[in-house]
Amino acid sequence: MAQRELLLGDEALALGALHAGLSGVYAYPGTPSTEITEFIQGHPLTAERGVHCTWSANEKTAMEEALGMSFAGKRALVCMKHVGMNVAADAFVNSAMTGANGGLVVVAADDPSMHSSQNEQDSRFYGQFALVPTFEPSNQQEAYDMVQAAFDFSEKYRIPVLMRLTTRMAHSRAVVEVAGVRAENECSYPAQTRQWVLMPGNSRVRYNTLLDDYARFETEAAESRFNRYTDAPDKSVGIIACGIAHNYLTENYPDGCPHPVLKISQYPLPASLVRRMASECGSLLIIEEGQPVVEQAVRGILPAPLDIRGRMTGQLPRTGELTPDSVRAALGLAPHATHAASQIVVPRPPALCQGCGHRDVYTALKEIADEHENAKVFSDIGCYTLGWLAPFHAIDTCVDMGASITMAKGAADAGVYPSIAVIGDSTFTHSGMTGLLDAVNERSNITVIISDNLTTCLLYTSD
């Protein structure tokens, strides 16, 4: 009898990676991806095998460290939240040009509805323009199985593979059947290193190879066990359901969907399966979490007169994460009976914790800033961002990791005085140091406060 475990989506992916012969995981923490690395760190197999686990300085360094392990023939995993892909983009996009040696899987955990993020960007776009195959599990079992398939795919085509999770997938639990444990790869090196040296002449050759391979990736997607066409008698509408959206569809049709369904969990989008559905159905409904990536692609594949519905046409909300109820409404089904929610506790808005050192920083900072009519305070990403809320109202901006120092510098260049930056220890080592170099180089008239709370809170501690 197969062993079964109750796992978060993050944990299922992490366990699948360990069982696939993982040698190293490199990550920068961020909701909803953090639990992947934490699970690997605490698993007995990690200690038994000596799997390398690292919280890197930022997502770019994590990507590069994993690429180095892949160069040496070992299987490596990179984990980050969706906005971390912006930081890792230079290394990620160019890793498609170098290719991989040992299996290399990059996990991006998206945050629709921005539960803990600045935006709800969709990481599938990175897979598209980097020409990297992308996997998107629809449930926890697939998260476990798929990461193992992703490592195999990476080594088959010598290419990094992107895996996309979403908040609900990452942070919900299900029973997962687990399989045997694969041995780690032995250390080995590429037969030739020309493609690893991205000089223009080498890159032009490699890019043509990558374009040829991308066509093969689509063929693989059309034949993948993770993409499935299920026929049904009512062909008035065909449904394309991507990733966790397929779970929501199944929840609304527990006895089977009466319409044809194309489940998509591996990209590039297989045009042949889309054309088959279009030829058999009167219209298409596209259900996907995040931005209308597949909906836009389908409109490019199919002739204009076909009725295509989804997030772009209002059948599904344009923003925010999907729910079984929003999918139910798009399917034209009557809503479930509901009951008024009980008011068990009074809502508690976010606030800096009692006793947190950041409170003292903001209390002192507010007193000083109140003495200067034009004082501006530029904050950064971390729990200290909560200084914007009552009772402090102490900051004016929070944009992205490291922006506090550079925005304060730019404001000072424009004549703002005093111009104050507030940044945490982790964010300073992530991307604040380069901005400080600019400020020092130009002798900028700014004040930089590095608020080191000596512990792991929203991000992680830096020594």
Question: Each predicted region: which residue ranges?
Answer:
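Short beta-strand segments
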Residues: C79-M80, V105-A109, L162-T166, I240-A241, ...
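DG-centered beta-turn motif at the end of beta-strands
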Residues: P418-S431
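Thiamine diphosphate
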Residues: M1-Q140, R168, A232, P258, ...
